[in-house]
Amino acid sequence: MINNVVLIGRLTRDVELRYTPSNIANATFNLAVNRNFKNAAGDREADFINCVMWRQQAENLANWTKKGMLIGITGRIQTRSYENQQGQRIYVTEVVADSFQILEKRDNSTNQASMDDQLPPSFGNSQPMDISDDDLPF
């Protein structure tokens, strides 16, 4: 059997990072994934997909991403169930992500000014050098 999922979408909220009693990282997040077609009004609808990630990748996801970022994930679909406080059995279908990739640059506008100060001066005003090629072996 094959159970592979590949999604590209935007985070609808910041990743929620928790730890199990045995100190295993668990990240939950929601991806908004645009559909490939437009509705009758000409708008593109989106699906909002619940996802979970575990261990080191979960910590990396929480540390490096934020709401609104475009990311890609790979993983599998998984169904689980639990009993709520009213005693009802609740079934949940979610994507268990194995890996992620950030698909856009991080917003570093706050660091941009300090980076510009550290860049070397432009060479746009310099003159070309006259170098003789008589000594070249080819």
Curated annotation (Swiss-Prot):
Any one of the GO BP annotations: DNA recombination
Motif position, Important for interaction with partner proteins: 133-138
InterPro entries: NA-bd_OB-fold, Primosome_PriB/ssb, ssDNA-bd
PROSITE patterns attached to this UniProt entry: SSB (PS50935)
Positions of region (Disordered): 107-138
Domain of life per record: Bacteria
Keyword presence, Ribonucleoprotein: no
Self-association state and partner proteins as the record states: Homotetramer.
Protein name, as recorded: Single-stranded DNA-binding protein 4
Gene label: ssb4
